[in-house]
């Protein structure tokens, strides 16, 4: 099936032939729907904290930072912002020249409220010889939009979200990336003022990100009294996946198999390369101005404290199990911990001998840990928290997307629709074992949880394979705890007009 040239291409990308063959099998067989026991809710998989607990975990996190542990905040930031401007691209190509839709009218009626307004005004003066106000008054709306989106102006239609100006301040306006620098200083700084932030970016924008850091870093260090260690990585070519045609044969372009990026699940490799004890993960577009940051900072510290508490308890159990110094009562206590704290159950454990039970417990406890914030549903999109079945017969907490659930099954559909919370992508992860050794994170991926989607390339249809999502199947075999966090901590920017919401003004 593969030519010598194909094999050279695989080697160049660092992809094993066996991996490509596995992907082709996945296209033919598809991915199974995932079985749900129930949606997670407060009291059934989601922890809701009272004021006393909240203060306890806040103090725990502050104490952890004082001990100078290595904490890194990682921000996936490679996606282009083009979808943010979908409606404005449509306006540019429309057969009318003045705003018609509600979206278009809102954009132009409030244009001076965008953080990029003064930059856009400069671009219009330079390229059109007229200000935004003059262009709008003369009905030349499309010139304003083309200066926003195209390379002759701000080029926002091709830049990633991290480089776009999101928020206005009295002295300067901030990009999404700068808001993450601020956040890092507020909840992830060690006692001696070290802040580690890692951005995953696309190769074409790496230089732009580095230039912005070089320009702004010292200002933020002075403002917050910290020292930033800012690093970048790109998705590895070895995580690209092969595309196929309608017959599930490799899709070829000029005779060469076409590979596509494997989606955010590929970032488990980047996460695996990070030298840290604890890693925060948060999307690039979920940021707010300083006046609204308090709930975000507070709950980041709280979920950090929950993680530290869990890890301490789990490490104590792992040490006992590895040493062999435990009683039957200790094993019962660990089973209760699995049931009540981690919502991991397996009916077969009641039939196990003590030695087998100890091995089972070690397998379930000695793995990476994540604590995930969950927000009450209010119509916002996002995957959901579930208690789900795993391949080994256990049930545990998982984050699944709607496409992974069989909506033709009435029970599964009801479980999905009865969900009270959604996943805002608000994670904190412990990635070392009780001896401080790093876990090898790709070992904990469930390969049966990928996605297949239909795409096109130069007018030809193809099927693309996405790897198990970073917070979905890529962390399927992690110890997981869900904590309820307030809706104020979730303020994503999906369209340019979202920047006009009060949360971004």
Regions found by a protein language model. Give the residues of each.
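Intrinsically disordered, low-structural-confidence terminal and linker regions
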Residues: 1-25
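C-terminal, active-site-flanking charged/polar segments
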Residues: 279, 389-424, 433, 449-454
């Amino acid at each position: 099936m593969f030519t010598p040239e194909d094999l050279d291409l695989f080697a160049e990308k660092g992809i094993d032939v066996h991996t490509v063959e596995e992907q082709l099998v996945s296209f033919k067989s598809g991915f199974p729907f995932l079985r749900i026991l129930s949606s997670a809710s407060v009291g059934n998989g989601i922890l809701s904290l009272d004021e006393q607990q909240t203060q306890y975990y806040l103090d725990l996190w502050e104490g952890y930072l004082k001990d100078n542990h290595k904490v890194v905040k990682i921000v996936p930031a490679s996606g282009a912002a083009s979808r943010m401007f979908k409606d404005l691209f449509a306006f540019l190509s429309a057969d009318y020249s003045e705003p018609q839709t509600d979206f278009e009218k809102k954009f132009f009626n409030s244009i001076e409220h965008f953080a990029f307004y003064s930059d856009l005004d400069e671009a219009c003066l330079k390229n059109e010889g007229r200000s935004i106000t003059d262009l709008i008054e003369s009905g030349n709306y499309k010139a304003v939009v083309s200066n926003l989106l195209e390379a002759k102006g701000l080029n926002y239609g091709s830049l990633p979200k991290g480089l776009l100006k999101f928020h206005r301040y009295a002295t300067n306006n901030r990009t999404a990336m700068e808001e993450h620098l601020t956040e890092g200083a507020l909840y992830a700084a060690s006692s001696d003022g070290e802040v580690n932030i890692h951005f995953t970016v696309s190769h074409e924008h790496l230089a732009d990100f580095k230039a912005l850091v070089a320009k702004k870093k010292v200002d933020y260090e002075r403002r917050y009294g910290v020292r930033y260690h800012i690093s970048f990585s790109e998705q590895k070519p070895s995580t690209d996946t092969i595309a196929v045609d309608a017959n599930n044969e490799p899709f070829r372009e000029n005779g060469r198999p076409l590979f596509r990026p494997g989606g955010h699940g590929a970032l488990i490799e980047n996460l695996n390369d990070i030298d840290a004890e604890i890693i925060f993960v948060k999307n690039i577009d979920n940021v707010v101005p300083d006046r609204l940051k308090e709930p975000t900072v507070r709950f980041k510290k709280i979920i950090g404290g929950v993680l530290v508490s869990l890890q301490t308890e789990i490490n104590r159990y792992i040490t006992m199990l590895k040493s062999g110094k435990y009683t039957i009562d200790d094993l019962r206590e660990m089973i209760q911990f699995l049931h009540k704290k981690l919502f991991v159950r397996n009916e077969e454990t009641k039939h196990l001998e003590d030695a087998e039970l100890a091995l089972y417990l070690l397998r379930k406890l000695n793995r990476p840990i994540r604590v995930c914030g969950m927000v009450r549903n209010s119509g916002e999109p996002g995957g959901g928290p579930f208690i789900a079945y795993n391949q080994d017969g256990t049930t545990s907490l998982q984050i699944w997307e709607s496409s992974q659930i069989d909506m033709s099954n009435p029970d599964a559909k009801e479980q999905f629709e009865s969900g009270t919370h959604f996943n805002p992508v608000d994670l904190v992860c412990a990635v070392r074992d009780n001896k401080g050794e790093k876990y090898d994170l790709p070992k904990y991926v469930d390969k049966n949880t990928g996605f297949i989607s239909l795409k096109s390339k130069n007018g030809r249809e193809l099927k693309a394979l996405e790897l198990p999502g970073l917070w979905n199947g890529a962390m399927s075999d992690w110890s997981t705890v869900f904590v309820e966090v307030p809706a104020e901590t979730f303020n994503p920017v999906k369209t340019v007009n979202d920047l006009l919401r009060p949360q971004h003004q």
